Amino acid sequence: MSDAESTTEPWETSERLGRVEPSATLAIGNRAAALEADGVDVVDLSVGEPDFPTPANVVEAGKDALDAGHTGYTSSNGVPELKRAIAEKLRGDGIGASPEEVIVTPGGKQALYETVQTLVDPGDEVVLLDPAWVSYEAMVKLAGGELTRVDTAPSFQLEPALDDLREAVTDDTELVFVNTPSNPTGAVYTDAALEGVRDIAVEHDVAVVADEIYGQITYGDVEQTSLASLDGLAERTVTINGFSKAYSMTGWRLGDLHADEAFVGEAGKLHSHSVSCATNFVQRAGIEALRETDDTVQEMVDAFETRRDLVVDTLADAGVDVGVSDCAFYAMLPVDDDDQAWAEEAIAEAHVATLPGNAFGAPGYARISYAASEDRLREAFDRLFDHGLL
């Protein structure tokens, strides 16, 4: 070794990155992709991504925007017509929204990240409802926040856990995350539960993040109530949404947040200094998605509902109760106590990719996504049965 060579790592990275691990969802997806690259047929039930194409008219709107030269910067918070369309949708959900209260972001994840960075200082208390989407925890830790977790298992409904939430939230709590319709559980919280959140938030003067990205993917007579539509919550709620799930636009990267103008003014500083703006032509496609895709979205939702029934019925026939999801395209499958080992065996032996529940704060479960064809779902369960995993 020469004198010039160093025995230390070349980069001394920030302490904050040591607080988090890589995304568990992406890690499993990468492992599935590596197996497939080696010629292995993997049934991937790990990814939270619709298997339907982006609606054709939305794709055409994106192409038209490119042809029209919409390739430069936009106003940092988004093009006015898209913000108007988002505000119109929010008003339909009972939220008194104006375009000035909207920030358009490159994906719903960016909207969440900007919200946490805007509200959370080192040492601030943040409450999560478990099971919770994996990136909430990472975002809070990157901001230096301290987590308190409230378990909703085994029902995965918030209403039975309201007393636990009341105990968890104090005057020192800065923020509560509420994700309904829920990833990973497929639960839609009752109005009584949401009113309980409202009462707790008002009592302790706490801000609420309402992640409603699955709001258009609900089944039967189930309807989602937007938290910010409740009296007393509009002025303390940041509503997060995006285009990835309902419009099958995951790779387009388009999302949004809504809050009062005071919050938007502060969050807009971070937004402008970090991402400048969401991609111009993608925003134009988003306008088309909001205004001209109701029938296409409903067709996708109907297909997901059929798949949900297939999952529930197939597992019920084997004596496994996963409950009936009210929304999204996920089911929480009860497995051995060591869910990490179960998920690793499922992909290594059965070549079925799932996600261990511990990644969501739900040990003893695996999350399966039914954003896959009925044939592939049947194939996945056949493999899991054959390998003694069910």
Residue ranges and their predicted role:
Residues 2-8, 21-23, 28, 35-42, ...:
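PLP-dependent class I/II
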Residues 54-73, 87:
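Glycine-rich phosphate-binding segment of PLP-dependent enzymes
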Residues 8-16:
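Short, contiguous pre-domain boundary segments
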Residues 73-74, 298:
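Short, surface-exposed loop/turn segments at secondary-structure junctions
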Residues 82-86:
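Conserved AMP-binding/adenylate-forming core of the ANL superfamily
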